[in-house]
Amino acid sequence: MTRRYWNINLEEMMEAGVHFGHGTRKWNPRMSPYISAKCKGIHIINLTRTARFLSEACDLVFDASSRGKQFLIVGTKNKAADSVARAAIRARCHYVNKKWLGGMLTNWSTTETRLHKFRDLRMEQTAGRLARLPKRDAAVVKRQLSHLQTYLGGIKYMTGLPDIVIIVDQQEEYTALRECITLGIPTICLIDTNCNPDLADISIPANDDAIASIRLILTKLVFAICEGRSSYIRNP
């Protein structure tokens, strides 16, 4: 895999608060190699390590997207949800940003059935068939559509398991991470000082609570994915 330059700037990361970890009492000792200092009861993340692993992750997603691979971005907590949706839409990736439904990947046949149901209902709505139903029946179908849009809207075009999963908060999305590990799906994980860096294929040490930090990391990854897709289009 060729190493590329991704314009990862330490000053830019500091401005986004990427270096702020959790309180010193709330940490995972396995994160010790990624912590550079303590300040006012907070662990400070070593941004040199962040830059290194973010660059590796960008190389990985560029290489994968240049070969037509599919990505899933997962981040369901409020601070991450909007950034996840925006990043995924920009890079034409699948995403989950509301709630991870247990078995979404490991029980793919059930998820696929739900997606088929969702597509059928959307087609009926587009064709105007809901208007012909009795009001009560139409209301039931609309509630179903709303529920499916909330939880499956980001993966409505997914036809199989993703090739790489990007996870914004390891602890918050632990179920999703375990499913990826079970299925052998490579993962890129944004990890704060309370996480286990050994669980993901590439762990990026960074503040997973600040919107600016999350957005910066996703922006770099999305740029690499888009660059890879452009390469794939030019050289299919």
Curated annotation (Swiss-Prot):
Keywords annotated in UniProt: Chloroplast, Plastid, Ribonucleoprotein, Ribosomal protein
Subcellular localization(s) per the UniProt record: Plastid, Chloroplast
Signal peptide annotation: none
GO CC annotation, single: chloroplast
Record-linked Gene3D superfamilies: Glucose-6-phosphate isomerase like protein, domain 1, Helix hairpin bin
Domain of life: Eukaryota
Pfam families per the UniProt record, alphabetical: Ribosomal_S2
GO molecular function: structural constituent of ribosome
PANTHER family reported for this sequence: 30S RIBOSOMAL PROTEIN S2 PROKARYOTIC AND ORGANELLAR (PTHR12534), SMALL RIBOSOMAL SUBUNIT PROTEIN US2M (PTHR12534:SF0)
Physiological role: Component of the chloroplast ribosome (chloro-ribosome), a dedicated translation machinery responsible for the synthesis of chloroplast genome-encoded proteins, including proteins of the transcription and translation machinery and components of the photosynthetic apparatus.
Assembly notes: Component of the chloroplast small ribosomal subunit (SSU). Mature 70S chloroplast ribosomes of higher plants consist of a small (30S) and a large (50S) subunit. The 30S small subunit contains 1 molecule of ribosomal RNA (16S rRNA) and 24 different proteins. The 50S large subunit contains 3 rRNA molecules (23S, 5S and 4.5S rRNA) and 33 different proteins.
UniProt record similarity statement: Belongs to the universal ribosomal protein uS2 family.
Stated name of the protein: Small ribosomal subunit protein uS2c
Taxonomic lineage from the root: Eukaryota, Viridiplantae, Streptophyta, Embryophyta, Tracheophyta
Gene responsible for this protein: rps2
